Amino acid sequence: PTRRSSDLICYYLTPRKYKNLVLTILSLIFYSWGEGKYFLIMITSILVDYSAGIAIYRYKEHKKKGISILCLSIVFNLGILFIFKYVNFFINNINIIFSLALSKVNITLPLGISFYTFQTMSYSIDVYKGRIKPEINIINFATFVTLFPQLIAGPIVKYTDIQNEIKARNIEKDKVQEGIEKFILGLGRKVLIANNIGMLWSEVENTGFNNISTPFAYVGILAFSLQIYFDFSGYSLMARGLGQILGFNFPRNFNYPYASRSISEFWRRWHITLGSWFKEYVYIPLGGNRNGKFRTIINLFVVWALTGLWHGASFNFIIWGLLFFSLICIEKLGLIRVLNKYKVFSHIYTIFFLLIGWTVFAITDFESKIGRASC
């Protein structure tokens, strides 16, 4: 806390034209403190995507060159994400399928890589689409990529969300006060609620589903459902609060998701920035719902398979994503009309399948889970 307070004082005392430089340095120090060995990955990502944005814009009249540069940028970002997050999952499945004994790579997942790679990809795509002009000032671009409040756990901030604030922002007393309130509320959600509820879930997890009563297993998954909400929404709220203290307005990431009356509505309220990213950069480019029901279902399948994989390199995350894909398709095919008529039933239906979904999300040992479910 003392370190962060001194950082804020340093930031506030810095003249406006140097604020981005100071903020970038502070953000890189913050990242190095947590992930020093991957510092160069972050720097390389900044340099590659900064250069790609300028090159894409330079060749905006030459579509082939522009798309080639965009593809190189995307391949780079997805490449580093694959190497650090998915390569061992891939090796493990190759070994199983072909009865091989390939050695796994001894690497750990860099903090925030799933977030900042998506942010930089959206930047390059937006430049190619002509939605924005490239950022010429590399310090401004580095500020966008490295902003420490949301670097580790989101929300996913697109360049279009904060481009005006990167170039010029005002530190207003009311906004700072509001930011402090959000930060304290988010910290309370994380420390006072999520951590304590998480102790119950940890007890269930450590004991094992085969060694506890069925009611306690249900209490455990309910605890996990609450923990993941208060934990993640707490981090997002702290990030938004810190952003406001620094003069930025990050997008909202949660909007009372457990009040939803359908799975479709839940995903409009939960991790909003991730859903928005996949909608804008995957679902709509694939055709969205413009080419008939069959193509819509295919497009949704791709989005939800990728959404599951984004959360982790394990089959339970893929199954989790495909579960929600199936439910959303069923709702689109007519169930939503029934849910809209019966308020109580719609809430019960939504919570029931969310609990099933969080069970899949939380537990990779499906054999014990199925055994407990059959009791």
How should each PLM-predicted stretch be described?
Residues P1-R372:
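Membrane-embedded transmembrane alpha-helical bundles that form the catalytic cores
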